[in-house]
Every structure is written in structure tokens, then in C-alpha cells.
Amino acid sequence: DAALLNQQDAPADDKIDIFLVEADNALKYVDTDYTAPVKDLGITDADLSKQYQYTKDIVTDSKGVLKGVSWQGCPGVLFYNREAAKDVLGTDDPDEVQNYVCDWDTFNDTAAKMQAKGYKMISSVNDTYRVYSNNVSSKWVEDGKVQVDDNIMKWVDDSKKLVDAKEAGTFDMWSDDWSKGFYPDGKVF
């Protein structure tokens, strides 16, 4: 950030030409003069036609101008315990299991079924955060004011319900206890 703020007075060889940004912070830079339209670099829509749209959306400014490109796409995926699926849902077939997690209301209903049979739906409420946070419709800060997107509040509400009902664990992501959920003895869907 400091280097970007000093662009005007920086010697030519010290000016930033290209910088990497994590998707979580992209919106901080997209609607600023610190970023330029990708088309100004000679990169065309045709050049980017096979990129996933979501990788372009995150770096498109409020005027619809593409200000960045991604070198990777990280799809969301749900890994599940097939034994738990058979035990609780009667099937471990991915097409059938999809019906039990097709939206948040159905996911939460399935969590109650899992809990009734002694399973947690997830090791941590943080396991679902990215799905909610990557589908927000507003910035965290607008006109100098912090705003919390409705989708983040839905995550908070859903997470609290899952924890209160003992349908989700509260382990720190990447911790040993969280990781145990990936094994049969972990009793996590």
C-alpha cells in the first residue's frame, strides 16, 4: 500500500507496474486510480474468453471495467464422508447427495439429520465461510463506512444455529482437531 501511495514521487525504476492481490483484497484496489484497465495493456476480451467469469468479476470496477486477470481458478467443492452419507442419507452417490446440500436451507436440514445420527455436518463453521463471502454483492467499505453484506450476516446466523444445535464443530481451521473430521472416527459428514 505504501508503495502505491508513493507512485507519483517514485523514480521511474521504482514505480509499480504489476502487483498481485488476493481476491479478499481485490475490491480495495479495483475502484482506484492505482489500477488501469486491462485493455490498456493490449489484453482483449477474446484473450480472456476462456477464463471463469468469477475470476473476472472480482477485479471488475463499479463502472464495469476489467482491472485485473487471474492466473488460477479455485472451484468450490464439497468433500463428504461416504460412510456418513450412506448411514444418514441412505446413499453415497454424488448426484443423490447433492440433493441434500443443494442450498443453505437444505444443507441445514441435513445437518440436523447428521446430528441425530451422531455426526457433525462440518468440523468448523469456517468451512462454509468462503461460500458465503465469495457471493456477496457489496464492498466491505463504501464511502468510508463499513458495511456488512447480507450474505455475511446469513453465514453468522446459520453458523450460530449449527453450533447451538451441536451440528457443527468449532475447531480452528487447519488444526489437528479440525483435520480429524476427515477420518471415519472424526464423525464429520
Task: Specify the residue positions occupied by each region the protein language model found.
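Extracytoplasmic "Venus flytrap"/periplasmic binding protein-like
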Residues: 1-51, 65, 87-88, 189
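Short glycine-centered helix-capping/turn motifs at secondary-structure transition points
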Residues: 33, 166-169, 181, 185-189
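Short secondary-structure boundary/capping segments
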Residues: 33-36, 134-140
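Short catalytic/ligand-binding loop motif for oxyanion handling, primarily in non-cytosolic enzymes
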Residues: 26-30, 76-78, 129-133
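Beta->alpha turn/N-cap motifs
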Residues: 21-25, 125-128, 176
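Helix-loop-helix "hinge/cap" segment bordering the ligand-binding cleft or interdomain interface
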Residues: 39-49, 57-128, 139-173
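Extracellular/periplasmic catalytic domains that process cell-envelope and extracellular macromolecules
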Residues: 10-14, 29-31, 59-63, 70-72, ...
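Short helix-initiation/N-cap motifs at beta->coil->alpha
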Residues: 1-5, 101-106, 171-184
